Design a protein with these regions (language model features):
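N-terminal signal-anchor/signal peptide hydrophobic helix marking the start
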Residues: 3-18
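Juxtamembrane extracytoplasmic/periplasmic/luminal helical "stalk" adjacent to the first N-terminal
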Residues: 6, 19-81, 100-107, 147, ...
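Solvent-exposed, extracytoplasmic
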Residues: 86-103, 136, 147-150, 168-215, ...
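Extracytoplasmic/periplasmic ligand-binding sensor regions of membrane-associated signaling proteins
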Residues: 100-102, 117-177, 243-249
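Amphipathic coiled-coil signal-relay and dimerization helices
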Residues: 112-113, 117-123, 162-164, 207-220
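Short beta->alpha transition motifs characteristic of CBS
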Residues: 122-125, 181, 272-278
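A short, hydrophobic, proline-anchored segment that marks a local hinge/packing element in signaling
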Residues: 162-170, 182, 255-265
Length: 295
C-alpha cells in the first residue's frame, strides 16, 4: 500500500510541476508577447513622427517649387500671350527637368489661367478648359488669400501633396500654377527600412475618379501609392476595420493606422504602416505582386 502511495505522491508532484510549468510558460509567453507589442508601439510611434516629418518636408519642397515656377518668365509670358502651345512646351520642359531628380520623377504640374480654368495638365495635355477650381480648396484659398498654399488634397488625379502659387505680372494675377507630388518616393523609402506604407483614400471622399481594375483591391479604399505598396498583404489588410483599430496584430504582422487629413482639415482616409517580424517571410514577400495578379 505504501508503495502505491509513494507512486501516487510522485504522480501528484509531477502533475503539480506540469501545471506550474504550463502556467509559468503561459505567463512568460504572455509577458513576452505584451513586451513585443509595446516595443512595436514605440517603434511605430517613432516612424509615424518620421512619416509626418517627411510629408512636411515634401510640402515645403513642393511649395518652394510652385513659388519658383510662378516667377518663371516663360510661364508668365505664355499666360500673358494666351499662347497655350507655348505653355504646353514650357510645362513639358519644366516637368522633364524637375523629374530628373529621383524624388520628383513622378511630379505633375497644373497650370490655370486667370479665370482658374485648367490650361495645361502635364499628365493629360489634351484635357483643358474645364472649371474644376470651384471644388478645389487649395486653388481657391490661394486666390482668395493671394498667397501660396500647400496641403494634401484628393481630386481626379488622386491624392497628392499639392502646392499652389499665383502667377503675378506687374501686380496683376494672370493665372496659377500647381505642383503635385505623389507618395511613391515615401513608399519606396520605407521599403528600404523594412516597412510597408499604404496610402488609402476612402472611396466616398473622392469627388471624381478615373476607374481602373485596381479599384477593386479594397472595397472601401483606393490604394493611392499602388506602385510602391506591398500587395502581398492585401488579404490581411482587407480584414482590418481601419475605423476601429490604431494598432493591429495578426501573427507576425503588425499594423499601425494613422488618419489621413487633407488641407481643409477633413479626414479622407488612412496611412497604414506594416511590419512583418518574421524575417524569412518578409524577405520572400519583397517580390511584390503586381495589381493584376490579385484578380
Amino acid at each position: 500500500m505504501s508503495k502505491y502511495k509513494k507512486y501516487f505522491n510522485i504522480y501528484i508532484v509531477l502533475v503539480v510541476f506540469a501545471v506550474l510549468g504550463s502556467l509559468f510558460y503561459f505567463l512568460y509567453s504572455s509577458y513576452m508577447a505584451e513586451k513585443k507589442q509595446n516595443n512595436m508601439r514605440v517603434f511605430f510611434d517613432y516612424h509615424v513622427k518620421q512619416l509626418n516629418k517627411s510629408i512636411d518636408d515634401e510640402k515645403f519642397s513642393s511649395m518652394a517649387i510652385s513659388i519658383l515656377l510662378a516667377q518663371n518668365e516663360s510661364v508668365q509670358m505664355c499666360l500673358l500671350g494666351q499662347d497655350r502651345d507655348e505653355c504646353v512646351k514650357n510645362i513639358e520642359n519644366l516637368t522633364k527637368t524637375l523629374g530628373a531628380a529621383s524624388m520628383y520623377n513622378n511630379i505633375k504640374l497644373h497650370l490655370y489661367d486667370k479665370d482658374l480654368k485648367s490650361y495645361v495638365r502635364s499628365w493629360d495635355l489634351n484635357r483643358y478648359g474645364d472649371m474644376i477650381a470651384s471644388g478645389r480648396f487649395l486653388v481657391q484659398e490661394s486666390r482668395r488669400q493671394n498667397k501660396p498654399m500647400v496641403g494634401i488634397e484628393a481630386w481626379y488625379a488622386g491624392v497628392h501633396i499639392r502646392a499652389v502659387s499665383n502667377v503675378m505680372h506687374e501686380g496683376k494675377n494672370i493665372g496659377s500654377i500647381e505642383v503635385l507630388l505623389n507618395y511613391d518616393s515615401l513608399g519606396n523609402f520605407y521599403k528600404t527600412q523594412g516597412i510597408d506604407l499604404f496610402v488609402l483614400l476612402s472611396k466616398d471622399k473622392m469627388p471624381a475618379h478615373k476607374s481602373a481594375p485596381s479599384d477593386q483591391i479594397l472595397s472601401e479604399y483606393y490604394i493611392e501609392n499602388l506602385s510602391s505598396a506591398n500587395l502581398n498583404i492585401v488579404g490581411i489588410l482587407r480584414d482590418i476595420d481601419l475605423k476601429k483599430y490604431e494598432f493591429y496584430v495578426y501573427k507576425t504582422h503588425y499594423f499601425c493606422v494613422v488618419p489621413l487629413i487633407d488641407a481643409s482639415n477633413t479626414q479622407i482616409g488612412y496611412y497604414v504602416l506594416h511590419v512583418n517580424t518574421d524575417e524569412k517571410e518578409r524577405n520572400i514577400s519583397q517580390n511584390y505582386l503586381e495589381s493584376e495578379e490579385l484578380f
